[in-house]
Amino acid sequence: MKKDFNEFKEFIVGKKVGVVGIGVSNIPLINFLIDLGAAVTAFDKKNLEELGDVADGFNKKGVKLELGEKYLDNLKGFDVIFKTPSMRIDSEALVRARKEGAYVTSEMEEFVRYTRGKVYGITGSDGKTTTTTIISKLLEGQGYKTWVGGNIGTPLFSEIENIHDEDKVVLELSSFQLMTMTQEIDVAVCTNLSPNHLDMHKSMQEYIDAKKNIFIYQNSNGLLVVNRENEITHGFIKEAKGNVKEFSSKRELIDGAYYKNGILYLEDKEVCKKDDIVIKGMHNVENYLAAFLATKDDVSVEVMKKVAETFAGVEHRCELVREIDGVKYYNDSIASSPTRTLAGLRAFDEKVIVIAGGYDKNIPFEPLAYEGYPYIKELILMGATKHKIKDVFDNLENEKGIKININMVESLEEAVRLAESIANQGDIVTLSPACASFDMYPNFMIRGNKFKEIVKSL
């Protein structure tokens, strides 16, 4: 049973509130809290000059600012603290604040606690954004007013009073957002799980436990959708309190969703043919199977089929940038883990020239070499992990005699220029880094846009 948002409005009036992080989602949050009558102090590592007009706007509204390297030193004496998702709950500043009696929360926790409308939460190591987007397209296609948020879309907490009982809310939720989530989510989807973000999580188990929070607080009416072919997500079944539905690209699941002989089935009814789906690759077949199960009570098979045959995909996900002299260039910048890169490579019908490497999340690259080599024609490595990735491919050669030609470069532009010189007519070049972007770019979107800019300049 969702709580009445009027309770929050009454609670927050006059409260001394700290908001950690002045990012995309927290700017509307801060403005909303001010409008609700809270006394807000915003904290950020950036300085006044870096914040620019944002700081000026907050100053005019009476928001206090704590900025710079030691910005958390004054996170004291607050009634409520909204933390940024990437801030660990066991950080020194938050531990101290909780001991002082502060209520520590996040925008997403409060949104899920109070929002009206059916909530669909999607998480996983790979496929979150595409599955989230497919689910939103299915619901919109059925005629529902649909709100998309979390890791994608727009910040929703400030829109909460515009969301109605009959609306649908679709949230992409990261492990960071889920670490402190204790709210019930009506429909929970976990696409798959593999090692990821181990630079932020203390262990793989902590990462898995964070993901479990998407379903662990459900009641008997909740629905959990998981991947039958992923050992970790399949294991979630024994802990689920509600209904569980599984999807598979490898076996028939009469009570779930499955792929067989070129056809996608939902509870043993044909939905569409694989070859008619616009976005290619078996990973996208799995994304559709998950989305079909998540929306089976709200969306007709006819709408599902139509969306599959018309939805053209999400930017930075195996996105065709252009074809030059018979060479196709794809932007798969979202591929920030080896498993995601493998999924992208398997979508092509031939060996490809791969540009990889980037920020080190402390996850193993062995799968990229030992499972990925059949799909790689040439490998161009860049970024902080290039030597680490090369070592794994060198081990592959030493152990199995399988050699992939590897080129080492210093920049993305050098990588693209080299790929252009190597490629022959009919070849495919893909940016599929298997790593995060933070060593070279602020996020995967900026990395992908830079790749597209370089390719378009060739």
From Swiss-Prot:
Any Gene Ontology CC annotation: cytoplasm
Catalytic reactions of this protein: UDP-N-acetyl-alpha-D-muramoyl-L-alanine + D-glutamate + ATP = UDP-N-acetyl-alpha-D-muramoyl-L-alanyl-D-glutamate + ADP + phosphate + H(+)
UniProt KW Phosphoprotein keyword: no
List of residues binding ATP: 124-130
Pathway listed: Cell wall biogenesis; peptidoglycan biosynthesis
EC number from the UniProt entry: 6.3.2.9
InterPro entries, A to Z: Mur-like_cat_sf, Mur_ligase_C, Mur_ligase_C_dom_sf, Mur_ligase_cen, MurD
Annotated SUPFAM superfamilies: MurCD N-terminal domain (SSF51984), MurD-like peptide ligases, catalytic domain (SSF53623), MurD-like peptide ligases, peptide-binding domain (SSF53244)
UniProt record, GO biological process: cell division; cell wall organization; peptidoglycan biosynthetic process; regulation of cell shape
Pfam family, one: Mur_ligase_M
GO MF assignments: ATP binding; UDP-N-acetylmuramoylalanine-D-glutamate ligase activity
Compartments where found: Cytoplasm
UniProt signal peptide: none
Keywords assigned: ATP-binding, Cell cycle, Cell division, Cell shape, Cell wall biogenesis/degradation, Cytoplasm, Ligase, Nucleotide-binding, Peptidoglycan synthesis
Keyword ATP-binding: yes
Family: Belongs to the MurCDEF family.
Known role: Cell wall formation. Catalyzes the addition of glutamate to the nucleotide precursor UDP-N-acetylmuramoyl-L-alanine (UMA).
NCBIfam families with a match to the protein in the record: murD (TIGR01087)
Protein name per the record: UDP-N-acetylmuramoylalanine--D-glutamate ligase
Organism lineage: Bacteria, Bacillati, Bacillota, Clostridia, Eubacteriales
